[in-house]
Amino acid sequence: MLDPALLRAGRIDRQILVDRPDRKGRQAILKVHLQKITVEPGLNGERIADITTGFTGADLANLVNEAAIVATRRGAVAVSLDDFTAAVERIVAGVERKSSVLRPEERQVVAYHEMGHALAASSLPAMDPVHKVSIVPRAIGSLGYTLQRPTEDHFLISCQMLKDRIVVLMAGRAAEYLAYGQISTGAADDLARATDIARQFITRFGMSPVLGQSVLERQSATYLGERMQGVGEKDYSEQTAREVDIGIRALIEEAYGRAKALLESRRADLDAGARLLLERETLTPEEFPALLPLKPVAVFTQVTETSP
């Protein structure tokens, strides 16, 4: 953070924001870091860039080191694409904690929860394809996770896509309710993320039918002395704040209702998928083609986790 006084005219006139690299930028960064390790013939930065959408330069450097460690642990001389894929998963979802043993009834709840996320994501056409579903606990504190991959970089997100993302997040809790008639604390992280999307939907993107097309909260700034989100007074009245809260609840309840209706229509798939997940613990698209319509798979972006 810089003091705003330093940014007055005549002091620092040029401000450059270094954003996350696009596909071509990732290739250039990877070209530098791949020189430090031995990779399998035919493997290059272009293929790895396809599985690293959203990664920063530091993330890519860490990825190369992590992939080399994965290859070393399996006794390989050269690093393969599978090693990079495993490294991405470790970075995004954390290290597996197979020593953590859940009670049978808890494993069942987690299995239904994660299969709910997976089925919702696969049923909504605008959502990123499901890459992996697992009920193996991870070091980051999750009891299970669902990984999704986009097919390309996204620069614009529609109103419907935001609503569908909330549906996918709420589908874990909806699956628990359909299977057991009650909900658990496993959706805590999902609720936090759904609330964040709903708040931005209303206050940043001007998509609320009630509050209209106005920006109530600025995007949080992380460079050159601009104010950070949450610092300072609110830009709107208490009445507007109440309307924002009502709008957030309405969006989440609407998404929860859609998630329940969707999973009810695919109840047989939900039950079959949960049973298969309990049996194998981790599923890839190749292992459940009858359950999840396959979509082109490219990179990790979203991890939907079950909290303790």
Question: Where are the model-predicted features located?
Answer:
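Short pre-active-site segment immediately N-terminal to the catalytic Zn-binding motif
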Residues: S99-V109
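Short regulatory helix/loop adjacent to the ATP-binding pocket of P-loop NTPases
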Residues: M1-R11
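P-loop NTPase motor-domain active sites and their immediate coupling elements
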Residues: D50, K98, L270-G273
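Structured loop/turn residues at beta-strand edges in well-structured enzyme cores
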Residues: G10, L43, D128
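Short hydrophobic/aromatic residue motifs in ordered secondary structure
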Residues: D59, G116-H117
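Soluble catalytic regions of large protease machineries
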Residues: R107-Y112, A118-P308
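Non-catalytic interfacial helical region
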Residues: D13-I16
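Conserved C-terminal "switch" segment of AAA+ ATPases
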Residues: P4-A5, V18-T85, R90, G94-V95, ...
